[in-house]
Amino acid sequence: MSATLSIQTDLVYATTPAGELRGDLYRPAGDGRFPLLIAVPGGAWRVCNRAKWRDWGEYLAGRGYALFAIDYRTATPQRTAFPEAPCDLLAAIRHARGNASTLSVDPDRIGLFGASAGAHLAALAALAPEHRAFEASKSLNGFGSIAAHVKVLVGAYGIYDLFRHWQDDLALNPPPDGNVVRNLLGCDPFDNQQRYVDASPLRQISYAANKVSALIAWGGDDEFVNPAQSEIFVRALQQARFNVRTHKAVGASHFWVNHALSDPLGHSARFAPVLAEFLDSFL
């Protein structure tokens, strides 16, 4: 471990009926009040690997930021993950704010950084932390009375309109293969339209939430998540008078955020200074 880097692994941030949830904290070494990004892994809401965020943790710590990469509850054939997954993320925000002194983070400078399904969850938490569907998040740790708002949202190739992604995934994976949105929500949109509305960040955009600054990134050649998901989301944020920055990774497909930052020609490395400038300005 670098003398300038502190890494704490397997920190428990919530206890759920399915077990404990943990995260890994990367931050500059020594005492301080470092601005914090909570990293939300992707994985089609089926898998969640926080270890993939180590590169970003080390990079951001080198720039004076902390990063808390978390696990959350995922969907299985026997269990949906909505509203559980966004509840877990909100619990992580409350945990970080409630333990700010112990973790050496600034409770007033917390943001979210998600990729793919993680960007979906991050957007939901940033836009609608007090949504009635997420009330259970307050009982997952001892910080239920603490606010779960954030200052910034960073979303990479996210899913923001679940009805549209349900349609796109149906075309890519026709029956009998499982539809990832159906696995998440436990229903089709024609079974329960309101559930799709509640779970879609696009439908949670409001003037009341526009104090959150957003950086939305996507790959121009993404074969798993339609780039229109990000483009339409950005347009709606702008219409609601959010402060929005964008980054289109020309020629990139999916997964590029978790490619090695050591490759100077990689899309992840090219995104790094864009992210750093955004955080320096708004977090």
What are these regions (language model features)?
Residues T16, L127, E135, S139, ...:
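Mobile cap/lid helix-loop segments that gate and shape the active-site cleft of serine hydrolases
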Residues R94-D169:
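Primarily recognizes the serine-hydrolase "nucleophile elbow" in alpha/beta-hydrolase
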Residues E223-I232:
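Conserved alpha/beta-hydrolase "acid-adjacent" motif
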Residues R33-G43:
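Short beta-strand element of the alpha/beta-hydrolase
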Residues M1-G32:
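N-terminal cap/lid segment of alpha/beta-hydrolase-fold proteins
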Residues N49-W56, F68-P107, D263-S268:
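Catalytic nucleophile-loop/oxyanion-hole region of alpha/beta-hydrolase
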Residues S262-L283:
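Catalytic active-site module of serine/aspartate enzymes centered on a nucleophile-bearing elbow/loop
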